C-alpha cells in the first residue's frame, strides 16, 4: 500500500504545471487512503474496494469510447482543499468518498488497466488482514478496555466514548467492542448519517441507561453534544483538524464536571499523524501553563455555551 501511494505521488508531481486541479484531487485521494490505512483494516479494505470499482467503471467507459471519454472524474475545488479544516465532519466524509473513489493519475486505457490490477491485489491483501484479526491498533484499545480506570468504585464499568472518523471503522469497532464485552445492548454508534432526533435519543440513553457503556462516534455526530456523563474517552483516529482533539475532550470535561476525566490518543509513531499530534501536545502544554492547569475547564465552558 505504501509503495502504491509513493508511486502515485511521484506521478502526481507531473501535473504541477499541466493540471493543478488534477494534482490536488489525486494528492487528496492518496492522503485519504493513507489515513484510512492508519484507521482500520475495514476502512482501508472498503476504500480500496470502492476505488477499484469506480476505476473499473471508468475503464469500461473508456474502452467503449476508445478515447477515454465518459463521466468526468470527481473533483474538489482548490478553495475546499485549502479550507478543509473549516468544514463539518459529514461534509468531509462526503468529499472523501467522492474523491478517494475516482481520482487517478492514469492518462491512458493501459495505465488505467494497470492501476485497476494493482488495486485488486491491494484489496485482496487488505481483506486477508481484515480476516486475520491481526490489528495492532485494536489490540491497544483492547488493552485499554482492561485497565483499572474502566471500573468505578462500585465495580461497574464506567462509560466510555470512542471517537473515530471513517464510517467503516465505526462499524468495525462496534462489532469488536460488542464481541469483547459480550452484550450488544452495551454499545451504540452515531455518525453524520444518523438523524438528529435519533442522535438525541442515543445520547440521552448514554447519559441515563446504566447498561449502555460505550458510545462510538465521529465528529459529525459529536458536534454540539453534551457527553458529560462519560469520563473516559479514546481518540481512535485523529481528526483532519487536530485542534478538534481539544473540542472532543471538551464534550466530557465541561464546567461542573466532578469526575477526573481521562483521554487516550491512539497514534502511530513515525507518521504524519504522529508529528501533528506531537505539535498539538506542545500547544496544549503551553496553554495549560498559561491558564494555570485549567485548559480543559475553559474548553468545557466554551462548549457549554455552544451546545
Language-model-derived ranges and their functions:
Residues 1-121, 306-307:
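Inter-lobe connector of SF1/SF2 helicase motors
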Residues 4-6, 10-17, 21-22, 132-165, ...:
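Conserved interdomain hinge at the start of the Helicase C-terminal
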Residues 47-56, 164-191:
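Conserved helicase motor "Helicase C" RecA-like lobe of SF1/SF2 P-loop NTPases
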Residues 171-174, 215-231, 249-257:
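SF2 helicase motor core recognition
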Residues 184-218:
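Conserved helicase ATPase core of P-loop NTP-dependent helicases/translocases
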Residues 225-238, 262-265:
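A short beta-strand element within the Helicase C-terminal
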Residues 241-263, 280:
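Conserved SF2 helicase motif VI
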Residues 259-307:
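C-terminal accessory region of SF2 helicases/translocases
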